[in-house]
């Protein structure tokens, strides 16, 4: 049965308009991008198959657009729409940070770091530089490494913060293993970074560790006091 033959209130697009995007399942949201679906299937069933074979949703959406375009049921047009939607989500979060919402909504900062770093196959350490009203000035990837780690140099973080005339910094890095639990090395380098920034009167507001699931926040655990 084609989706157009479904009751109106069950169709993904109509359901979204009537009840909001949160009312849709992962498959229903993905079906909006899939379009007509594969031959003999409606778009929702095609979306379910994509999630079953290439999911869960996070792993599917973390793929580059060129990879998505090769998956049965998507193709170049749908892959481009998905990639554009992901980029819009990142820019939306960044615009919120630029308006000074970095401290009023810490989970959004964690989500932003997660979107930027989670899919990397190697460790990346990044910094979000903030002005004295905690508005985002710039986001920079400062250090890259291997699947096992990256060398972090606090002096370079301080240098970049001074270059941006930042009053505060939030940093984050990913764990390619998927386990977001901070290591002893993570805690040690964060202490060095905290001390180095304090010497030039710049605050380290948080350090997020990105893996599968929810990012781990050093500030939330009281490790920056």
Curated annotation (Swiss-Prot):
Alphabetized Gene3D superfamilies for the sequence: Cytidine Deaminase, domain 2 (3.40.140.10)
SUPFAM superfamilies reported for this sequence: RuvA domain 2-like
Keyword RNA-binding in record: no
Keywords for this protein: Hydrolase, Metal-binding, Metalloprotease, Protease, Zinc
Residue intervals of the MPN domain: 102-224
Top-level taxon of the source organism: Bacteria
GO-annotated molecular function: metal ion binding; metallopeptidase activity
Entry-linked InterPro entries: MPN (IPR037518), RadC_JAB (IPR025657), RuvA_2-like (IPR010994), UPF0758 (IPR001405), UPF0758_CS (IPR020891), UPF0758_N (IPR046778)
Biological process according to GO: proteolysis
Span of the annotated motif JAMM motif: 173-186
Residues binding Zn(2+), per UniProt: 173, 175, 186
Family: Belongs to the UPF0758 family.
Protein's recorded name: UPF0758 protein XCV4028
Naturally occurring in which organism (per UniProt): Xanthomonas euvesicatoria pv. vesicatoria (strain 85-10)
